[in-house]
Amino acid sequence: FKPNSTYYYQVKLNGEWQQAQEYKTGDPDNFSFMFVGDPQIGSSYKQKNAESNGKKLGNDLAARNDSYNWNVTLNKAMEQHPEIDFLVSPGDQVSVKGNEDAKDLKEQEDQYSGYLSASVLRNLPQAVAIGNHDCSSASYQNHFNNPNPFLEESTPTPAGNGYFYSYGNALFIVINANNYNAADHKALIEKAIKENPNAKWRIVVMHQDIYGSGLDHSDSDGIILRTQLTPIFDANDIDVVLQGHDHSYARTYQLTSDGQAHDEFLEYKQDQGGFNHDNFDERFEKDGVFRAYYKSQNLCYNIADKSQGTVVNPEGVFYLTSNSATGSKFYNLIPEQQDYVAARSQNWRPSYSVINITKDSFTVNTYDVETGEVIDSSYTIVKK
């Protein structure tokens, strides 16, 4: 494909050609993408409303409602920001984990259908990570054709592998963080950089938020990877890490590794690269000494720059955690804001971010879906 060009394509369905669709390529020297968090179609199944007679919605109604809201989010985002060239998600496109159980797989497929039914996606490319709700079945691979899959991954999940791609002068490295073997992620990052040595911007996309501010994950299982990935990102000059998982918004200061050795808590890793959440959660809740030790080990970072607005040639990595793009599920913020957090928000409404990249700048703005109003102040990194 050539930059700044319009293409058309058609799909043949049941022997009939469908209506032609339009696809426009962007400007590699000045492009924008939409960053949306945890659409998680079907996750509202526990909610109650008049339609469900005060009972839980159930999977069918939840998938329908969440799909409708997903479509609204994408339509409003494109209306408000027609400059968007593609979409990035940190994972959890669906809610049912689909652990190869026939009933679960059927429900998961219904949710994928809802996710992919959004009309905007006929014309907008997307690059999505594998979330913890996506990782347990091969269904993800049936719906997304990812470039440059990291087949050398030693402990992939059933959903597949990490991958990478470039757009303009930016290299995007998409990690399957449900694999808790950090050596795999290190190898993927190094391979992607080796094949794209001239990329000015190095961006990692992953599901688990190792520097978030949500109550559900940011102080417990969500940071089990922090001690391992922080020095890897630092050593490979990663500029930005885009995260999800905590269904709340958070933006960090510029962070570096403290350069010290920290416990990797190997006893909670599973053979296939996963994480034993039940054993960890039980000990974390009941054992105060362990909880204090765990939190102390996760102080594995330094705050390199607290500047706001526009920062020029900053040290360290910038981490952004997205809130829910559909409103299917939200989490509270952790009561005490962590020292690495520059800004955070939970207004219980769907949101999305628009990220613009030029030859010299990376700028993020985050918006309320319904009103289009800015949720957080603009943040720009300039590299000269």
Regions found by a protein language model. Give the residues of each.
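Extended active-site neighborhood of metal-dependent phosphoesterases/phosphodiesterases
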Residues: 6-22, 48, 55-60, 99-202, ...
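N-terminal active-site segment of His-dependent metallophosphoesterases
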Residues: 3-6, 10-101
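Short acidic, glycine-rich surface-loop motifs adjacent to enzyme active sites
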Residues: 90-97, 196-216
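Catalytic-core region of carbohydrate-active enzymes that cleave or remodel glycosidic bonds
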Residues: 110-118, 224-246, 349-350
